[in-house]
């Protein structure tokens, strides 16, 4: 099909918005369909593309008006829309050169955020505080997030814990699920037979094997599970906790899931080892065996809803964790501790 403009003269002479028509051709036959009719049968993705096309025409029409114009883009790119994402980034880079355009870009897409951060403009991460005020924090994580975790700074313990799922993902893709190092890191993130006996040094040695020049000045003789829980306690008890810092959210998510699994294992009669989707399958067992009460069930379901996707280190999985408030995670951690 071809896209045409029904009111081309009016766009040029009267600055009207473009009215699109679609010409569908099948051999010698041609049928013209207007935008309103077409929207009745388009998918959401196709409607989005059509909407963007309409906006682009309107922006282009305003380029030469010599009037100051504020452009606000709100979640213009979907998480998995790689092809259009790069096109949108390049277009935004182009139009920002126009001195008449002032641009505000809002997004939940972490990968898109990092892509446009190279423009060098002001960057903010926004959260809502306890008084329900909207707070603009300094934009972080514009460079490689994983590289920042290699630093021996005040976040060293949180950085170390955050790197565990990242390296586990590397092993998952490069080796197999029977690999000893993969199994060790799995036991750091899920309650297995050996989880309570793992030392910090064991996990640290695996991280060093896959992260170049990684050093962490932490107590290697500590029990890893106690180390994770202790770090979660420090985060939960911090005054004026950083609401944006990803490490806080990832570490709390890991601690919450471990606490939940530890609790459920104490309640069920487990006949066979669970090899996949452990938290979910443990919850299913508690229901089958009628092992938990309604209050406990409510808390565990919140754990399943929040933490599952937050412990994978890639661009899209940042989106749910960025949207989850730190206060919500702290409360859930305290709830699961007291369950």
Sequence positions of predicted segments:
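Walker B catalytic acidic pair
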Residues: 74-82
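Aromatic- and carboxylate-enriched substrate-binding clefts and catalytic-loop regions
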Residues: 77-78, 92-93, 97
